């Protein structure tokens, strides 16, 4: 009997929500949101990050001023223990999600590899 792929995806969603890194991420995010200085700095970082991504997607040049502003914000972020913990935890969770993505994509990878070898 074949499993419904959507049911498996919901099981995966539940497993991620129950993952210790995800729980720590939620706690870290709440701690950042509860601290006005951390929240403001994190919001500034996210705004800057989205602005740079938007420029890149539109093919606009990232200026030296953009780079300098980004470096200044990152330097301040590194001084904030709450944000640093949040970002480290998010990075660990991203590694797990990346690993899961590789596993999910394996059938397609094998299919195309077999097609190229034929």
From Swiss-Prot:
InterPro entries: Com_YlbF, YheA/YmcA-like_dom_sf. Gene3D superfamilies: YheA/YmcA-like (1.20.1500.10). It holds the Pfam family Com_YlbF. Transmembrane segments: none annotated. Belongs to the UPF0342 family. This is UPF0342 protein BC_0880. It comes from Bacillus cereus (strain ATCC 14579 / DSM 31 / CCUG 7414 / JCM 2152 / NBRC 15305 / NCIMB 9373 / NCTC 2599 / NRRL B-3711).
């Amino acid at each position: 009997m074949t499993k419904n792929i959507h049911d498996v995806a919901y099981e995966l969603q539940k497993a991620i929500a129950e993952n210790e890194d995800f729980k720590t991420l939620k706690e870290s995010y709440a701690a950042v949101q509860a601290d006005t200085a951390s929240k403001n700095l994190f919001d500034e970082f996210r705004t800057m990050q989205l602005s740079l991504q938007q420029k890149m997607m539109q093919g606009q040049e990232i200026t030296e001023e953009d780079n300098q502003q980004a470096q200044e914000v990152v330097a301040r972020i590194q001084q904030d223990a709450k944000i640093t913990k949040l970002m480290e935890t998010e990075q660990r969770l991203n590694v797990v999600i990346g690993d899961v993505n590789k596993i999910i994509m394996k059938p397609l990878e094998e299919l195309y590899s077999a097609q190229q070898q034929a």
